[in-house]
Every structure is written in structure tokens, then in C-alpha cells.
């Protein structure tokens, strides 16, 4: 890499890297470094009794701050549990006559961001801070790019690494400098573990189903399409795993569940990412009433396991997952929030309702989609506390069993929390003839232009023809659940690496383009370093200013390039250029 492409800090760090190697120190050793203690545990178990032998520890981590005070140096080391101060004195770490390790390695070659391992004893400083007195130090990894230095004073943060786009692109930096971010993802793991434990205690089996599918079934969504070269067939990234899990119920499992990575080629916003994690569970011999009770119990248990309470604040709103939850039919919900009773309405009448309410719609939408748009626009946002919206119209639910008392409805519920859907569940349709008819209705919607209509899966129908017991299934958006339990209002905050637009790169002319103006090849990187990334930007400044900046860089970095004069720079700027 050209030295001019580096910042001053990066140049200094690379010089330190070279100096370490010249001293015979490997800045990236391969050998295992034994760790027997961690920062939080050391502080928690410290015994300050002077009569007790000082505890010997071996810890490792990243340097987050350092203060050099002549023959002594204080550093703050960050490990998996937190941070702890370490204290290094010249004579303790270099007990002999040779003090070069302290004077050169500790004082000059260590930087914030470096990984080191230290061995020593635990003590309390005169200021009362529990620390490690270092007797031995090992370099584990040299950081050649500086971390953002976040400062804090009296509870106020300065120079914070807070720009959302930068944080999401460089999550590895975000995790290092913003400690609360790591806490979010630790809680995410706790949520998954708690849910998995709850299911396992019930005797249900965790399974894996295909991510690449020949038919993208189980949800109304637009799929990502790819191609299998060996088989020469199109394949789709999974939009849902529902139909495969139901096949397993046909095969004799009483209860199966899966945490699945799903992919939907649709919009991105604060609650949607094209790649997301869902959990789906299917239990034989149950119905949607049982599943509502089960879902309440599960969520209450998870909240207690992760937070120790069922209450949490999200955007200033207090949400309580304590069971039981309110239950409202979809027809009742629409009537409550619009004053219109849509029960029994046909497609034309629903379009009139949309027009009256100002709900956007188009000719590709069937009856179910129109009802969904009305509910989404006028009702959904009002359900802040956990609420089951039940008994959806049949047209909205092609995989759901017909309601036992009303043939126009289905036995389906969605759990609404904080104005968004969190979970979706059915009494599953197990009549193969009815299922085929529902798929054929979806095909008609597809022919009208609805690109979210479901595909016909003939193999799934064949599985149903062998017989599937009465079953209830439930799917839950894990990312949204984690958002709620960690008080986040954007899905990007609970995804380690959310999908992002390509990073913007400033336009930069090549050496060949500068050569057209007579700029020698060796001066092009210098122009770039000075901020003249294009010929046009070079032409916009006065020749004297351009020349002075180039000569300053030439001198500062000891490039040894031949001197410039005003006439030469003026000639570059005035040369014809297309």
C-alpha cells in the first residue's frame, strides 16, 4: 500500500509494527495464550485483605486507554466481560539491566486497539481501583488502524461513534467502543436460548429444513431467485419453512420447531430487513386457541429469563408481556377503528371502503389483500400492548383451516405488539382438497399481477393426502422480539450485520487521466493525498496553492520527488482535457 494512502496514525502504527519485528517480537503470534481470569470476575471476587496472598492472574484483551508516567504506565484492558486497569512498572517488567522492553515496546510500540496478554497479581491502587500489577506482558495482535477514541466526562460522552450508517457498516468497531451494543446481542442469544429451552421442556424437536427451495411456499412474499448450475433449475431462497415443517407432522412428529433464516425480496425499513430470523413451531392435535395460551406462556417465560420482569420500555411506551393478552377479531378491530363493518363485503364493496378511508389499492389486490391493507393502515398501529387479532377472512389465509362456526373466516391469529405484528398462528388446514382449491385461488391472484401470491406446491398437497392430524402452528419474528426486549426501535440495531446500500466512494481519476494533462505518474498519489481526486478538482484551485500543498506532502513524507514550479502546475491546469 502506498504510504500516501495512509493516515498519519496508520503510518506511525506501521512503523511500530516494523520496530517490534526488528526487536524479534512477533506482533501476531500463533501460539495459544492461556487466560485464567476475566475483568468482571476479578473485580467481583477481589479480597482486599492485606494478610491474604495476592491472586495471580493471566488475562488478555484490547488496550482501550493508556497513561505513560515515566517509569510506570497505566492501561485499561477490555476483555469479554468488561474493562480492568493494568499497572506496568519498568523495573517489574524488566527486572534486569536491560530496560528496552519497557522503554521501547511498552512506551513506544503499544497503541490503543492492540491486543496484549498480561500476567501478574491483583491489587487495589491508592485511588481505590482494583487493578492488575503486570509482571509479564505478551503482544498478541497489533492494530494498525486506530479506533475512534470515545471520551466520557461526568456522564457525558464526547466524540462518540454514533452515526448509524457507520455503526452498521463497521459493527466490529461499534461493538468495541459502544459497550451497550454488545449487551443487545448478548440478550439476543438469551432470547433464543430461553425459547429453545421452553420448547425442549415440552418435548418438541428442533429440526432443519432447506434454505434453497424449488417452490417458495409458506408465505405471501416476493422471493430471491437463483440458479443451480448442476441441475440447471431455478431455485428460491426460503421465504418461510412452514410447508416443510408440516410435512414432518405428516411423517409422525408430534411437535417440531426451527429457527430459520428467511429471505424476502421486498422493502427495507425500521422493522424489515430482506434477511431475517423467524421461529416456526407446529404441534399435532392442537388448535389456535391452545396456541394463543402457549404463546402467552412462552413470551412471559422469555421475558422473565432475559429481563427478570415482563415489563419493558420501547420508545417511551411501557409494554407488559404478562399473560393473558387481549383478544379481538379482525372484523371487530376494523369496526372499532373505522366505524365500518366489513363482514360479508365483496371485493367491489371493499374497494369502495378503501376509497372512503383513503387506503391505497390497485387492481392486482384481491379481497384478502384489500382487508389486509385496511387493517394495516387504520388499525395495526393502535395495538401497543400484546393483543391477539383473531379470525381472519379466508382470502387472507390460504394455509389456514376454515373457522368452525363461520365459513367466511379462518382460525388464525396475529399477535400485535407496539403497533406491529410479532407472531402469526393458525389452526392448520389439513384438508388436501380444500388446500388445492386455496392454492388455485392464489394462482388466479398471481395471474392478475400479485407478485406476493403463493405458488402451488403439489408435493405438499400430496403429503396432506397421506393425512395430517389436526395441528396448530405459530411463527414469530425473532428480530422484532429482540427489538422489544432490548427497547430498540430499529431492526438494524438487533442485527449484527444488517443489509446496507453499497458504500459511497468519492470519484477518483486514474493516473492515465491525469497524464493527459501532463501530470507525471509519481505526482498523482500526491495530488490524491492533497485532496485533488479528479483533474477538475485540481483545476479549481489556484496554481500556487496546489504547488504548495504538493511540496509540503513531498517534504513531510520524504518522497524525494523533483521540485515543482508554478509554471509546471499552471501547465497541468491549463492543458486541454476531455
Curated annotation (Swiss-Prot):
Signal peptide: none
Annotated Gene3D superfamilies: Bira Bifunctional Protein, Domain 2, Nucleic acid-binding proteins
Keyword Ligase: yes
Gene Ontology MF annotations: ATP binding; lysine-tRNA ligase activity; magnesium ion binding; tRNA binding
Superkingdom in the source lineage: Bacteria
Record-linked PROSITE patterns: AA_TRNA_LIGASE_II
GO terms classed as biological process: lysyl-tRNA aminoacylation
InterPro entries linked to this entry: Aa-tRNA-synt_II (IPR004364), aa-tRNA-synth_II (IPR006195), aa-tRNA-synth_II/BPL/LPL (IPR045864), Lys-tRNA-ligase_II (IPR002313), Lys-tRNA-ligase_II_N (IPR044136), Lys-tRNA-synth_II_C (IPR018149), NA-bd_OB-fold (IPR012340), NA-bd_OB_tRNA (IPR004365)
Keywords noted in UniProt: Aminoacyl-tRNA synthetase, ATP-binding, Cytoplasm, Ligase, Magnesium, Metal-binding, Nucleotide-binding, Protein biosynthesis
Cofactor-binding details, from the entry: Binds 3 Mg(2+) ions per subunit.
Entry EC no(s): 6.1.1.6
Required cofactor names: Mg(2+)
Residues that bind Mg(2+) 2: 421
GO CC, one annotated term: cytosol
Subcellular location: Cytoplasm
Chemical reaction(s) catalysed: tRNA(Lys) + L-lysine + ATP = L-lysyl-tRNA(Lys) + AMP + diphosphate
Residues the record lists as binding Mg(2+) 1: 414, 421
Subunit structure as annotated in this protein's UniProt entry: Homodimer.
Family, similarity comment: Belongs to the class-II aminoacyl-tRNA synthetase family.
Protein name: Lysine--tRNA ligase
Species for this entry: Porphyromonas gingivalis (strain ATCC BAA-308 / W83)
Source taxonomy: Bacteria, Pseudomonadati, Bacteroidota, Bacteroidia, Bacteroidales
Gene name of the encoded protein: lysS
